[in-house]
């Protein structure tokens, strides 16, 4: 790719929403180059998307274009959008082009990195499987996460994706020596603000000495133009790649929400005049997703474990956007509205959530057998629900009645109080070690706690807490 040695100058010829056409006199800037202009006294970055002929390029604006006029001068930066990386970004909030938006002064980074990078080659990738313990029972037992894997949180609106992501950051940042990067892609500004202040309160961001913080934040919220929302995930990933390569640790990369990345790509695609494909999405949907996801990987230097919230439009998992994401994931955590309606949080569907690690050679026989036994009881309960709805519990055999009773206890035992939800629930959050999770569920499946009431299993940690709650309930009833 040849770059112009002198800075190419051009002028704006057309503005259609977030898409801007720029005509150049001499050498055309390369595709994906960043162009600079000013709008209302503020710097505006444009990214080259198409060469149209007649020395004109079509660009996507990374900020609002209201007030931009034809004839405005534009200069080519000669490189793609580059953002500050390294420890100077810790505890800070950046926007898509790497500018600080937390009102804490400029970022003193010595190094910048282009947001468009190639995925690591085969030789440098690492392939070993190791479980990443989250302290959340339902995840660790039934759909465990792998270090350096990609995890998808699927769910419709309002079933708890963001709260689960916040709890994962909270749990892992506390027990984890590595760094986290959080990319807020097209989600609510209020949530981004709340998250920032929660990080400060919990000590994940050290406001007195920012470089001792454990997380860097990159935001491109709902009110941003589609160009910013389509690129902000790449900005966050670029920060995560730098932490992985420089420190050689396990970096956690959180994206909330990957669907908005697709949605922004679809808006940009329509503005660029591409013919839409299925359900109105961009024809390059799989390519866009692949370019992002293939960069999220473990190398011999370190690993990036990514947790991605994936909004499911109208709760339809066959929609092209969530369906395209499925292909890239190692584990899926599906949040179910039916479970959230029962008041069971986290509302993880124990039968619909999957993991590549569900293998006795990776997890060990005890963990694998316990998980499969739990799923077996829940599956049997699910198949009996139609009979119960039509004929009632009395028509079931004694064995089935016992299965239903155990399944209802297991269902409640899969709930857990969260640290980040303490303001809603009033009860302090708990993290349950993996060995206690396995032992507790093994005992429940074996029928050792058939004598405890259902309510004792709701919103507790391990089985000892359930026993203590049962004793408290018995004392209150006496």
From Swiss-Prot:
It is found in: Cell inner membrane. GO terms for molecular function: ATP binding; ATP hydrolysis activity; proton-transporting ATP synthase activity, rotational mechanism. GO terms for cellular component: plasma membrane; proton-transporting ATP synthase complex. It is a peripheral membrane protein. Keywords: ATP synthesis, ATP-binding, Cell inner membrane, Cell membrane, CF(1), Hydrogen ion transport, Ion transport, Membrane, Nucleotide-binding, Translocase, Transport. Gene3D superfamilies: 2.40.10.170, Bovine Mitochondrial F1-atpase, Atp Synthase Beta Chain, Chain D, domain 3, P-loop containing nucleotide triphosphate hydrolases. ATP binds at residues 155-162. The keyword Membrane applies. Its EC number is 7.1.2.2. PROSITE patterns: ATPASE_ALPHA_BETA. It catalyses: ATP + H2O + 4 H(+)(in) = ADP + phosphate + 5 H(+)(out). Its main location: membrane. It comes from the Bacteria. Pfam families: ATP-synt_ab, ATP-synt_ab_N, ATP-synt_VA_C. Belongs to the ATPase alpha/beta chains family. Produces ATP from ADP in the presence of a proton gradient across the membrane. The catalytic sites are hosted primarily by the beta subunits. F-type ATPases have 2 components, CF(1) - the catalytic core - and CF(0) - the membrane proton channel. CF(1) has five subunits: alpha(3), beta(3), gamma(1), delta(1), epsilon(1). CF(0) has three main subunits: a(1), b(2) and c(9-12). The alpha and beta chains form an alternating ring which encloses part of the gamma chain. CF(1) is attached to CF(0) by a central stalk formed by the gamma and epsilon chains, while a peripheral stalk is formed by the delta and b chains. This is ATP synthase subunit beta. It comes from Fuscovulum blasticum.
């Amino acid at each position: 790719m040849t770059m112009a040695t002198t800075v190419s100058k051009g002028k704006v010829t057309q503005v259609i929403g977030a898409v801007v056409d720029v005509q150049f006199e001499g050498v055309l800037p390369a595709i994906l180059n960043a162009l600079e202009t000013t709008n209302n006294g503020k710097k505006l970055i444009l990214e080259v998307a198409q060469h149209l002929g007649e020395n004109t390029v079509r660009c996507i604006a990374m900020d609002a274009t209201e007030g931009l006029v034809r004839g405005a001068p534009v200069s080519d930066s000669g490189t793609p959008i580059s953002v500050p990386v390294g420890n100077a970004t810790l505890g800070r909030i950046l926007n898509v082009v790497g500018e600080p938006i937390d009102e804490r002064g400029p970022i003193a980074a010595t190094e910048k990195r282009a947001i468009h990078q190639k995925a690591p080659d085969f030789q440098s990738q690492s392939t070993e499987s190791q479980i990443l313990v989250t302290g959340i029972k339902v995840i660790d037992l039934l759909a465990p996460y792998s270090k350096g894997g990609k995890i998808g949180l699927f769910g419709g609106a309002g079933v708890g994706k963001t709260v689960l992501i916040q709890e994962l950051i909270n749990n892992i940042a506390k027990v984890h020596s590595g760094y986290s990067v959080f990319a807020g892609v097209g989600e609510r500004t209020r949530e981004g603000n709340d998250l920032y202040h929660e990080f400060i309160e919990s000590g994940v961001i050290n406001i007195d000495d920012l470089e001792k913080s454990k997380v860097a934040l990159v935001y491109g919220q709902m009110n941003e133009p589609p160009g910013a929302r389509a690129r902000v995930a790449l900005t966050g990933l670029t920060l995560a790649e730098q932490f992985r390569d420089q420190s050689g640790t396990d970096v956690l990369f959180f994206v909330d929400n990957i669907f908005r990345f697709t949605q922004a790509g679809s808006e940009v695609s329509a503005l660029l005049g591409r013919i839409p494909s299925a359900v109105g999405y961009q024809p390059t949907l799989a390519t866009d997703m692949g370019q992002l996801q293939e960069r999220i990987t473990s190398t011999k230097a370190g690993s990036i474990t990514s947790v991605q919230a994936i909004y499911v439009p109208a709760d339809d998992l066959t929609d092209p956007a969530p369906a395209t994401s499925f292909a890239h994931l190692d584990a899926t955590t599906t949040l179910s509205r039916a479970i959230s309606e029962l008041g069971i949080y986290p509302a993880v569907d124990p039968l619909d959530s999957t993991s590549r690690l569900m293998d006795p050679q990776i997890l060990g026989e005890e963990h694998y057998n316990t998980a499969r036994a739990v799923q077996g009881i829940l599956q049997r309960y699910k198949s009996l629900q139609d009979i119960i709805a039509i004929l009632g519990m009395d028509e079931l055999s004694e064995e089935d009645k016992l299965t239903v009773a155990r399944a209802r206890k297991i269902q409640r035992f899969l709930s857990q109080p969260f640290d980040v939800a303490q303001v809603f629930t009033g009860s302090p959050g708990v993290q349950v070690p993996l060995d206690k999770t396995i032992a507790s569920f093994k005992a429940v499946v074996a029928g050792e706690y058939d004598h405890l009431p259902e309510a004792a299993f709701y919103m507790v940690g391990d089985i000892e807490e359930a026993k203590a709650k049962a004793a408290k309930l018995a004392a209150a009833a006496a």
